[in-house]
């Protein structure tokens, strides 16, 4: 009888720890998806670089707007870039040594999407 009681307590404990963590993760993912849909393929300014997001089979990917020389476009040109839908972009899934601070800006773009309150 005591074994059954301990097993029951174990499942209650696990249920009270795991379920709130899963629901919090789902809430954050939903908020990030709502932020992603609100952007509507427009670019946002992160670290004086223009970023946008794509929803792919592996999740949301950040991408930075670049000119024809693979130099990130500054935030001062956001209206031009949002009006011109044929802008070149680089995805953040690969590290770029030729662009200083590329990885840091990408991490910040992801954190701005997922952790805004």
UniProtKB/Swiss-Prot annotation:
Compartments in which it is found: Virion membrane
Post-translational modification: Contains two intramolecular disulfide bonds. They are created by the viral disulfide bond formation pathway, a poxvirus-specific pathway that operates on the cytoplasmic side of the MV membranes.
GO cellular component, one term: virion membrane
Annotated GO biological process: membrane fusion involved in viral entry into host cell; symbiont entry into host cell
Sequence ranges on the Virion surface membrane side: 22-117
Record field: transmembrane: 1-21
UniProt key word Metal-binding: no
Keyword Membrane attributed: yes
Keywords from the named record: Disulfide bond, Fusion of virus membrane with host membrane, Membrane, Phosphoprotein, Signal-anchor, Transmembrane, Transmembrane helix, Viral envelope protein, Viral penetration into host cytoplasm, Virion, Virus entry into host cell
Principal location listed in the UniProt entry: virion
Family recorded in the similarity comment: Belongs to the orthopoxvirus OPG147 family.
Chain's role: Envelope protein part of the entry-fusion complex responsible for the virus membrane fusion with host cell membrane during virus entry. Also plays a role in cell-cell fusion (syncytium formation).
Oligomer and partners: Part of a stable entry-fusion complex (EFC) which is at least composed of proteins OPG143, OPG147, OPG155, OPG086, OPG094, OPG107, OPG104, and OPG099. Formation of the viral membrane is necessary for the assembly of the complex.
Name of protein: Virion membrane protein OPG147
Organism name: Vaccinia virus (strain Western Reserve)
Encoding gene per record: OPG147
């Amino acid at each position: 009888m005591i074994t059954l009681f301990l097993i029951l307590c174990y499942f209650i404990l696990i249920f009270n720890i795991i379920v709130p963590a899963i629901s919090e993760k789902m809430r954050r993912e939903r908020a990030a998806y709502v932020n992603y849909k609100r952007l509507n393929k427009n670019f946002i300014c992160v670290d004086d670089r223009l970023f946008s997001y794509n929803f792919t089979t592996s999740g949301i990917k950040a991408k930075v707007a670049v000119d024809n020389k693979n130099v990130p476009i500054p935030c001062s040109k956001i209206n031009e870039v949002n009006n011109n839908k044929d802008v070149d972009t680089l995805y953040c899934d690969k590290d770029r040594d030729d662009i200083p601070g590329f990885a840091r800006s990408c991490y910040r773009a992801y954190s701005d999407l997922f952790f805004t309150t």
